[in-house]
Swiss-Prot record:
Protein name: Putative F-box/LRR-repeat protein 8
MF (Gene Ontology): ubiquitin-protein transferase activity
Positions annotated as LRR repeat: 119-144, 148-173, 174-199, 205-224, 250-275, 301-325, 326-351, 354-379, 383-404, 405-428, 430-455, 456-480
Keyword field contains Magnesium: no
Record-linked PROSITE patterns: FBOX
Naturally occurring in which organism (per UniProt): Arabidopsis thaliana
Length: 554
């Protein structure tokens, strides 16, 4: 039996060896075709190989037979597939791909939908060739600076002729574009949906032309529009008022001329007004009965009182409200907003330390706004009375920030730690808290993930260490001085010598990594630089005194 098995294995090995020798001959035949041309006979046996054929790619053996170079797979890809690949690349990679061949250059230009250009006066010479290559642009950004002459009306209209499918337009620092340029541009680009202007030279006529021509406009942002003066005409509503969802006005001298547009935008969802002069109470009173779909309101440094807040409270669907440095707003206006806007989720208040918004308004917020998830109080002085009401009633409160408050101490912080169960992020800045309040966070707020403490002199590194031991997964970002800062008065002669501030020691105590903020780095660097300069000044003064005493003794 063993002899039979051995003879059988020996025959099998012999067959395998014969096959290997035959296949080697076929490989030699494939690798050295020049020998066959000299009359050398080829092997009769040739191993059959299964060839793969793709419905998209042709048979590679037929096209590459006898070729020494590897087959180019990408050449057989359709333009649509290559365009999809290019869309997933970065701008730098797209530039490199455009240098490969003319076909890639054409496809790269066709798949570019966003184009950002430096809008100088010499751009007009390259507009035809530039937009012939990039003929599928839907988002266009034109930027210029004060040092150079910007793009003119003729060049601006020339661009619109070649970009009729444009949906987004952003102009920054283009004072040479006038009302005529905007009118000509909007005649050719009627599909605009998002428009943003900053530091441009056109005025009311250009804005009205935009609103009357681009009927599908959804977002409008205007900043420092120089053509709108004190005696400007009214803007809007226009045909685009029905489709507008976002309006943002920044740093306008006569922003009240947009009142017809605001009152005519029935579907307006987001309203942002930043640092615009003039009385806004009348504007909001005209808007209150006509616009009811507003969800988000941002108001910063504008002249508005409780009358304006009362008018805005008619929009019962408001979920986000930012009141930043509006000193004429008081607890009365905030209470009316809280009573009528019960869906409020985010509330940011910067009281500018005027003490006009405090416990009374915040208690009303706690009473009606149960869905509150984010609360930011800057320059407001809440006490335990209002904070306890908020953390007890607003059970979904996840983010809380208390900055620049003189009344938020350890008592208030202990109340937050005890009753704010859903809190995930806490920020305390420039408040009179100590290590006792920080220790209380270790026993409360079970869902807390991140704590940020800045410019709180009573908090030391020891308190942060103890918090880390109790809550290992908690990220703590601490910016506390090692030694108490000596306060000094500043008189006519400048800062006194004893008013030396020591640089704070930045301590980050996470078990999970956390990047420190750039502002804290810059402030710490400035403090170190000031301390070193003062130390050098003192050393120089001592050297001078020593040299004088030596000269006198001699």
């Amino acid at each position: 039996m063993n002899i039979y098995i051995f003879s059988k294995e020996k025959k099998r090995k012999k067959v395998v060896c014969d096959n290997l020798s035959k296949t080697r001959g076929s490989r030699r035949e494939h690798c050295e075709p020049h020998r066959r041309r000299m009359g050398q006979s080829t092997s009769k046996f040739r191993r059959s190989k299964t060839t793969f054929t793709s419905p998209v790619l042709p048979n590679l053996r037929e096209q590459n037979s006898g070729a020494d170079e590897p087959y180019d797979y990408i050449s057989n890809l359709p333009d649509e597939c290559l365009s999809l690949i290019f869309q997933s690349l970065t701008c730098a990679d797209l530039k490199r791909c455009s240098l490969v061949c003319r076909r890639w250059l054409t496809i790269e230009g066709q798949c570019r939908h966003r184009l950002s250009l430096k809008a100088q006066s010499d751009l007009i010479s390259v507009i035809p060739s530039l937009f012939t290559r990039f003929d599928s642009v839907t988002k266009l950004v034109l930027r210029s600076d004060r040092r150079s002459l910007g793009i003119c009306d003729n060049a601006f209209v020339m661009i619109s002729v070649r970009c009729r499918n444009l949906t987004r337009l952003k102009l920054r620092g283009c004072p040479e574009i006038s009302d005529l340029g905007i009118i000509g541009f909007t005649e050719n680009c009627r599909s605009l949906k998002k428009v943003s202007f900053g530091s441009c030279g056109f005025g009311v006529k250009g804005m009205n032309a935009l609103l009357n021509t681009c009927l599908g406009l959804e977002e409008l942002s205007v900043k420092r529009l120089r053509g709108i003066g004190a005696g400007a005409e009214l803007i809007g509503p226009g045909g685009a008022a029905g489709s507008l969802k976002v309006i943002c006005l920044k740093e306008l001298h006569n922003g009240q001329c947009f009142a017809p547009l605001l009152s005519g935008a029935k579907g307006l969802r987001i309203l942002k007004i930043f640092r615009c002069s003039g009385d806004w109470d009348r504007v909001f009173e005209a808007v209150r009965d006509k616009v009811n779909a507003i969800v988000e309101i941002h108001l910063e440094r504008i002249q508005m009182s409780d009358l304006g807040l009362t008018a805005l409270s008619k929009c019962s669907g408001v979920e986000v409200l930012h009141l930043v440095k509006t000193p004429d707003c008081t607890n009365v206006g905030l209470a009316l907003v809280a009573e009528r806007c019960k869906l409020l989720r985010k509330l940011h208040i910067d009281g500018w330390k005027t003490n006009r918004i405090g416990d009374e308004g915040l208690i009303v917020v706690a009473k009606y706004c149960w869905n509150l998830q984010e609360l930011v109080l800057i320059g407001v002085n809440p006490t335990k009375l209002s904070l306890e009401a908020i953390v007890s009633n607003c059970l979904n409160l996840e983010r809380l920030a208390l900055c620049g408050s003189d009344t938020v101490g350890d008592t208030e912080l202990c109340c937050i730690a005890e009753k704010c169960l859903a809190l995930r992020k806490l920020c305390i800045k420039n408040c009179p808290i100590t290590d006792d309040g920080i220790k209380a966070l270790g026993n409360g707020c079970p869902n807390l993930l991140k704590v940020k403490v800045k410019k709180c002199r009573g908090v030391t590194t020891q308190g942060a260490d103890l918090l880390r031991k109790r809550r290992a997964l908690l990220v703590v970002n601490l910016d506390a001085p090692e030694t108490p800062i000596v306060e000094g008065s500043v008189g006519e002669g400048g800062a006194q010598e004893n008013a030396v501030e020591f640089p704070p020691s930045r301590l980050q105590i996470p078990t999970i990594g956390l990047a420190s903020g750039s502002t804290s780095r810059s402030s710490s660097f400035k403090l170190r630089l000031g301390f070193l300069s003062q130390r050098n000044f003192v050393s120089c003064a001592l050297r001078r005194l020593g040299s004088r005493s030596r000269s006198r003794n001699e």
